Amino acid sequence: MALHDARPPFAAIGGTVPPEFSALPTPCYLLDENALRRNAEILGGLAQRTGCRVLLAQKAFSNYDLYPLLAPHLAGTEASGLFEARLGAEEMPGEVHVFCAAYRADEMDELLRYADHIVFNSPAQLAKFGAKVKAAGKSVGLRINPECSTQDGHAIYDPCAPGSRLGTTRAAWDA
């Protein structure tokens, strides 16, 4: 049975809206905690079976009231900058990984208080901050742009599109 076959359908899709919904202010977000828990359990099982570490991408989901529900199944959080790193460190147990297209020198000391792993976008950023990050006992990464796009028609969203500034290319690495 496919995973999507096991999920109950949402009543409002092709059905009726539950009466409780009419009392809610709009717009608002509705979250199904049971579905969220099931998905977290699936991710936790994946981590156990493969040895990988699954992180919560806070850019996509930063509802920290639900972090306690997710925490038993995830290794930590991923952040795109200082404020998300702080949120992850304060609200979710586990690792905090940070990737940012460019880091600010005036934020690096504070970022190092929260981050466990920092990924740089270019050899220049790695050269500028790498030694300081390592001296603070944090692990370091460099985002690589493989320059091999897997999609057509959406170059603006494609990190491997020609001209993308996300990750270092072979030419930039060799320079």
Feature-to-residue mapping (PLM):
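Acidic, low-complexity proline/glycine-rich segments
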Residues: M1-V17
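N-terminal glycine-rich anion-binding loops that anchor highly charged ligand groups
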Residues: A12-T16, E41-I42, Q48, R53-F61
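Generic N-terminal amphipathic, Lys/Arg-enriched alpha-helix
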Residues: A12-Y29
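A glycine-/small-polar-enriched, mobile loop at the entrance of the PLP active site in fold-type I
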Residues: L24-E33, C52-Q58
